[in-house]
Regions:
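Anion-binding alpha/beta catalytic cores of soluble intermediary-metabolism enzymes, centered on
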Residues: 1-197
């Protein structure tokens, strides 16, 4: 199964994944499970009060899981400079500092700057709010004109990779070709034999 293949690829390798909603009990439970099984090194974002409050209310033990408070990040000035540079005149320092109060922007910059390997969000944030920072700060992979997404659908023994159900609203013919190629590439990376329909 796709999930098993992904787990094998990252397990025990110290892959750091940022969870933008560290105050959500579902996120905390997932982070605990991933850490206990040495799948990834989860990083919970949020204030100490938010994270501890959620853990206490839900009888969860998040001790030993890295937590980063965007309000007290020691490399914030470096992050602000980098984000101003990436936004190239679209956001000044003041606007960047405001944006970085959002854990979606903050988490995306942690990935962009190499402090984390990936990001998971969307438990409480909308898809648009989760994806927008990545579109603005990470950009498309080299050789690609656009960014697309894919969903993994698993039901019993059936596995499907559905291409771009949420990013490109009205793709033209060329876009559809690129989305198809990107989705097929993602499927192969997951160890799935591709049949494009």
């Amino acid at each position: 199964m796709i999930i098993d293949e992904l787990e094998k690829k990252v397990q025990g390798k110290g892959v750091r994944i940022v969870f933008t909603e560290g105050w959500d009990p579902r996120v905390q439970k997932a982070a605990i499970d991933l850490k206990n099984n040495d799948v990834v090194c989860p990083v919970l974002l949020g204030t100490p009060e938010e994270i501890a409050g959620c853990a206490q209310k839900n009888s969860l033990n998040v001790e030993g899981i890295e937590q980063i408070d965007p309000n007290n990040f020691e490399h914030m000035d470096e992050m602000v400079r980098k984000m101003v540079e990436l936004r190239r005149g679209k956001m000044d320092e003041e606007k960047v500092r405001t944006a970085l109060k959002s854990t979606n922007y903050f988490g995306t910059m942690l990935v962009q700057m190499g402090y984390a390997d990936g990001l998971l969000g969307g438990a409480t944030y909308s898809t648009a709010d989760t994806v927008r920072p990545a579109l603005q700060l990470v950009k498309a992979a080299p050789g690609n004109k656009l960014v697309s997404s894919c969903f993994i659908l698993i039901k019993e023994e059936t596995q499907l990779i559905m291409g771009d159900c949420s990013i490109n609203i009205n793709p033209n013919t060329d876009d559809l070709v690129e989305i198809t190629m990107q989705t097929a590439k993602s499927a192969r990376q997951f160890g799935v034999e591709t049949k494009v329909a």
